[in-house]
Regions:
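Non-catalytic signal-transmission and effector/linker regions of two-component phosphorelay proteins
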Residues: 1-2
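Two-component/phosphorelay signaling modules centered on CheY-like receiver
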Residues: 10-30
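CheY-like receiver
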Residues: 37-115
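Conserved acidic carboxylate
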Residues: 7
């Protein structure tokens, strides 16, 4: 499975990438620190899954979901993650495949990956 990560916290994004590659044998195609750079990665790679942080410096991740279909043609599943549980319902309403709360629990991530 091919993955792109968009998270403005460089260390969190790198830790997630390492976990996805080592524990789940996923191919992380890139990690962007903002939505604009993330769009470039999505256009270039057409991943199967996007791990998207809600709080980004240039746009709210929840608003970013609305723009994704033009870039992924509906083929990319979005897994959002956030430290704020009040965003969970909105993320699902915006068609997120799943939502994880930070810090990401590996048991919860196991469940998401298996789906």
């Amino acid at each position: 499975m091919k993955v792109v990560i968009i998270d403005d916290d460089k260390n969190a994004g790198l830790a997630l990438a390492d976990l996805l590659e080592t524990r789940y044998d996923m191919e992380v195609l890139g990690h962007a620190l903002c939505a604009l750079d993330g769009l470039a990665l999505l256009n270039k790679h057409q991943p199967d899954v996007l791990f998207l942080d809600v709080q980004l410096p240039d746009v709210n991740g929840l608003d970013f979901i609305d723009k994704l279909s033009a870039f992924t043609h509906g083929r990319c599943q979005v897994v959002m993650y956030t430290a704020y549980d009040e965003f969970v319902v909105t993320a699902f309403r915006k068609q997120a495949f799943d939502v994880l709360l930070k810090p990401i629990d590996t048991k919860e991530l196991d469940t998401v990956v298996k789906r």
